[in-house]
Every structure is written in C-alpha cells, then in structure tokens.
C-alpha cells in the first residue's frame, strides 16, 4: 500500500481482511507477480469503475489463470466468456460462476492470450499495417516536383 493510501487501508480495508481465508501479500515484484498469478485459481476482477484496459487481466491470462470480472469498461473486450474467464453482472452471479471459472482449461487460457495479446501477435499486426501502407494506392499526384509540405497537406482530404 503506498503512502497516500495507508490510512484508508488501515481504517477501511484491514478490518475486513483479518478473518480466515484472506491474506494480504502487499506489493510484489514482477517475478513474484508471475508466480503469484500462476498459482492463483482465478483473478477476481470485481471492480466498480469502467477500467479502460485492465492490464492485470492480461497478466493473469498470460500465466494461464482465468478471470472472473464484472461487466465494466474493457472487460468484454479482454475476457472471452467461457474460455479465458467469466463476465458477470453482480456478486451473486460471481459466486455462482466461480466453480466454472476455476474449472476452465488453463492451457486454453494461455493459448488465447498468445492469440490475442502476445508481443509476437502485436508485432505481426504492426508489420501487416506497415506493409499495407507501403502498398501502391490510388493517390492523387499533386506534382512531379517537390512542394512544401503545407501545399501537399492542403490537398489531402481523408474519406469522411
């Protein structure tokens, strides 16, 4: 817990996690995170705000760990229902979905991560875009001689 949040953690969170079944591990480094996520039965991503990406979901799936998440923000773009995890609309639904989440094939979770989020897949996508930009197009030729950039830019009208 960082300094800004210490008082909040001490007053609001710590009393809730003193019982059995909950262990606060604190901050962990990257190596520890891989081990931690890889040994988890699931990542519980039950947040109340519209997270724009949710890197922790991707990190869990990279370790083969399925995700149980509320339908918020980017969750539906990241989690493949019934393959890499389950998307739910509330706590009651999360409780019912948990046995299904932990039963998912962790190898399939990892494979889907590789297919969708790996650096190899992203690099291939970038190459495909670069090659498409390099391909001949039906561009309007402004002039056979070099012109100032402003003059060329003034003739560019993207499709609307």
Q: Residues of each region from the PLM?
A:
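A charged, aromatic-enriched C-terminal amphipathic alpha-helix characteristic of glycosyltransferases
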Residues: 102-148
């Amino acid at each position: 817990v960082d300094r800004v949040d210490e008082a909040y953690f001490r007053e609001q969170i710590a009393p809730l996690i003193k019982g059995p079944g909950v262990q606060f591990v604190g901050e962990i480094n990257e190596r520890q995170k891989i081990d931690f996520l890889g040994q988890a039965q699931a990542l519980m991503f039950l947040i109340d705000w519209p997270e724009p990406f949710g890197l922790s979901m991707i990190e869990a799936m990279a370790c083969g760990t399925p995700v149980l998440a509320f339908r918020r923000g980017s969750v539906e773009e990241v989690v493949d229902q019934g393959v890499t995890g389950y998307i739910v609309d509330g706590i009651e639904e999360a409780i019912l979905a948990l046995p299904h989440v932990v039963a998912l094939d962790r190898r399939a979770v990892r494979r889907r991560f590789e297919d969708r989020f790996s650096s190899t897949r992203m690099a291939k996508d970038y190459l495909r875009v670069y090659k498409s930009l390099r391909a001949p197009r039906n561009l309007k030729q402004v002039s056979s001689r070099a012109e100032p950039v402003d003059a060329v830019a003034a003739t560019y009208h993207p499709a609307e």
